[in-house]
């Protein structure tokens, strides 16, 4: 079983964590290709391409300039500790013990516009490149064409040892679209998190993102191998609702914190 996550825009390279092992990303050559494209763009071009403020555009141009194919403790940080958005606040990797991080390394994959796929302990240099960015590149007009079936091939290989391969999709559609399902050949289970608002249950982005991280943490802490066990997820007031779910789309609802 693999759990898929989206990356985060917000990054934390200030907090240092000693004694955490690291690995290297799988697609450094491809990342280098993309960085070479990005390095030729001005802050104004990056601002327009990514719809960023002038300050954020300048920051990311500086990141592209500083990016190197050689990763080190000086320029990199483990992905699961570097990402700092809503999903990763829910996951709270900083409080996980080494054994949990080791399990996550083999069962969690973070999809990335620049790195393709990151394992939790893969070193990552800071960047901003969302998967939906229409970046013209040597392989096509966007990142979906650039990555092609590479991401799916990697995930397929990771699942090869499983008799009944299952992917738990906790990523956004923007990122999951980068996975070629014809190549992956696995059962895909989508987890949907809904909150009660305005008289009905609906997906509220902030809460749903955080819940994806909470679900990943739940699986990591319990080292879940059987996907069905995820239906027991009961963190932060969420609960599985069979009547709103089907075989491959599992709905978890929260009426208010602590109440289904």
Give short role names for the model-derived ranges.
Residues 4-95:
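Active-site helix-to-loop segments that bind/position phosphate- or nucleotide-bearing substrates
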């Amino acid at each position: 079983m693999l759990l898929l996550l989206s990356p985060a825009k917000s990054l934390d390279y200030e907090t240092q964590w000693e004694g955490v092992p690291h690995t290297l990303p799988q697609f450094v050559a491809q990342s280098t290709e993309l960085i070479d494209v990005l390095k030729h763009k001005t802050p104004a071009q990056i601002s327009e391409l990514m719809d960023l403020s002038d300050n954020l555009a300048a920051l990311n141009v500086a990141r592209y300039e500083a990016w190197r194919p050689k990763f080190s403790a000086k320029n990199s940080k483990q992905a699961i500790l570097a990402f700092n958005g809503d999903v990763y606040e829910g996951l709270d990797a900083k409080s996980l013990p080494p054994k949990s991080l080791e399990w996550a390394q083999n069962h969690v994959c973070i999809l990335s516009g620049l790195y393709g796929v990151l394992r939790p302990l893969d070193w990552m240099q800071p960047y901003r490149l969302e998967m939906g960015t229409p970046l013209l590149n040597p392989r096509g007009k966007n990142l979906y064409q650039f990555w092609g079936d590479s991401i799916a091939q990697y995930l397929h290989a990771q699942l090869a040892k499983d008799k009944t391969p299952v992917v738990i999709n906790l990523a956004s559609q923007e990122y999951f679209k980068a996975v070629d399902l014809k190549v992956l050949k696995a059962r895909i289970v989508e987890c949907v998190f809904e909150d009660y608002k305005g008289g009905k249950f609906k997906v509220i982005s902030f809460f749903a993102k955080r819940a994806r991280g909470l679900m990943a943490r739940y699986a990591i802490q319990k080292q879940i191998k059987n996907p069905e066990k995820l239906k027991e997820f009961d963190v932060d007031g969420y609960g599985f609702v069979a009547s709103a779910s089907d075989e491959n789309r599992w709905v978890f609802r929260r009426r208010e914190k602590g109440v289904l």
